[in-house]
């Protein structure tokens, strides 16, 4: 019993993970309505994060792309990757740093819903980091 507890404790200390559920910002600027109409904004749908250092508003900007779906028709918006929006600026600096220095484990849609004609999308991100990367992350 003690060894199991100790193993779990050391696993968390030596190999911690950082996890968030974040809103996707700027969805009204992109093809999210068409993607939603095709039923692709489902929980668990895989997304890709791409840093955009040349962004004029935020040099740490991170784009969120919905991956292409192999089962989609050739001319649907799901056939090729679609830009959903961005990581919020409040988190973009740290997420951009983690994309360079840590292993992204999970990037998927947590939820998507409409409220008052506005689409809200949330993504779940999980990074596996070494203990020293976690320390560097928290002191940034």
Language-model features: locations:
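Conserved active-site motif detector
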Residues: 1-140
């Amino acid at each position: 019993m003690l060894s199991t507890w100790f193993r779990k404790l050391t696993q968390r200390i030596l190999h911690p993970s950082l996890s968030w559920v974040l809103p996707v910002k700027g969805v009204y600027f992109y093809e999210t309505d068409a993607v939603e109409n095709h039923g692709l904004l489902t929980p668990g749908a895989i997304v890709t994060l791409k840093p955009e250092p040349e962004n004029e508003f935020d040099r740490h900007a991170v784009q969120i792309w919905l991956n292409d779906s192999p089962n989609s028709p050739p001319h649907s918006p799901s056939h090729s990757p679609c830009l959903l929006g961005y990581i919020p600026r409040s988190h973009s600096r740290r997420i951009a740093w983690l994309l360079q220095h840590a292993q992204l484990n999970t990037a998927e849609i947590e939820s998507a819903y409409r409220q008052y004609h506005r689409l809200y999308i949330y993504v779940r991100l999980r990074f596996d980091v070494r203990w020293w990367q976690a320390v560097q992350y928290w002191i940034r």
